[in-house]
Amino acid sequence: LVIVFVVLLGVPLISANEEELLAILQDQRNDARGGCLNRYKSNICGTLVTPMNCITPRTRMGKFARKFCQFMCGIC
């Protein structure tokens, strides 16, 4: 009886989680930037690292900008 109870509760939880994951995946596929993610959007890319850093690839800030702020540099 306990096993049946656990299975009956577990199946809807897994299904709801799967639907949520599919929705997230679909949002990423429909992203206009082609999957280019901004991992540092609130604190680094755009405030500390500027688009001017994208044109200086030999500096440390330029290397960081081209690697992690690709949306800002137009690489995506």
From Swiss-Prot:
Q: Does the keyword Transmembrane helix apply?
A: no
Per the record, its GO cellular-component terms are: extracellular region; nematocyst
Q: Where is the signal peptide?
A: 1-16
Which residues form the propeptide in this entry? Answer: 17-33
Alphabetized, the UniProt keywords read:
Nematocyst, Secreted, Signal, Toxin
Annotated compartments: Secreted; Nematocyst
- From the Swiss-Prot or TrEMBL record, what is one GO molecular function term? toxin activity
Indicate whether Signal appears among the record's keywords. yes
The superkingdom of the source organism is Eukaryota
Family, similarity comment: Belongs to the sea anemone 8 toxin family.
Protein name as it appears in the record: U-actitoxin-Avd8c
**Organism of derivation:** Anemonia viridis
Lineage, broadest ranks: Eukaryota, Metazoa, Cnidaria, Anthozoa, Hexacorallia
